[in-house]
Amino acid sequence: MTTTRHRLLATASRFVTTLESLDVDAMLAVRSPTCLHHMCLPSFRNYSITNDQTREAFPQWKATITKYQFGILDDSQTLVDEQARKVMIRAKTAAETTVGDYNNEYVFILRMTEDCDTVDEIWEFYDSLRLRDLHHRLEGGHVPIGVDAPAPFTTTGSNSLDRSK
């Protein structure tokens, strides 16, 4: 018999695997149709995006990446709250982009659906200095970013989507 904890961890593992795959269909398949992805970085910009917005932004993001690795930084720091259906993971990325290397660390909090099979909400926290450096290099390389660019390349403005529970 599979426990709630095992189902939550299996879904979190699929989330990580799909991020590394750079396959937008696989990335969205592990999410519920109403999943919101919150970028939580007060010193840079907070915003939330839907699955449709993720799909729209993905080609631009993927076009800047030539090699990509994403994974759990430390399994011992993974936390599971079975009652809230949440998993917190600490992750890292190492990428080669069209404007040089990009490395970052992340904390993801994933809230799963009631059956624990898909991710219903994502809170993503990351090192803003490293992201800002990448944005400056992209701007220098004339990659369109800013208010009119699709997320995750938007740098100003706000999004009022809120699914606080």
UniProtKB/Swiss-Prot annotation:
Pathway stated in the Swiss-Prot or TrEMBL entry: Secondary metabolite biosynthesis; terpenoid biosynthesis
Gene Ontology BP term (one): terpenoid biosynthetic process
Source superkingdom: Eukaryota
InterPro entries: Fungal_Meroterpenoid_Isomerase (IPR050977)
Subunit structure of this chain's protein: Homodimer.
Protein purpose: Part of the gene cluster that mediates the biosynthesis of calidodehydroaustin, a fungal meroterpenoid. The first step of the pathway is the synthesis of 3,5-dimethylorsellinic acid by the polyketide synthase ausA. 3,5-dimethylorsellinic acid is then prenylated by the polyprenyl transferase ausN. Further epoxidation by the FAD-dependent monooxygenase ausM and cyclization by the probable terpene cyclase ausL lead to the formation of protoaustinoid A.
Comment field (misc): In A.calidoustus, the austinoid gene cluster lies on a contiguous DNA region, while clusters from E.nidulans and P.brasilianum are split in their respective genomes. Genetic rearrangements provoked variability among the clusters and E.nidulans produces the least number of austionoid derivatives with the end products austinol and dehydroaustinol, while P.brasilianum can produce until acetoxydehydroaustin, and A.calidoustus produces the highest number of identified derivatives.
Family to which the UniProt record says this protein belongs: Belongs to the trt14 isomerase family.
The protein, known as: Austinoid biosynthesis cluster protein J
Origin organism lineage: Eukaryota, Fungi, Dikarya, Ascomycota, Pezizomycotina
Gene field: ausJ
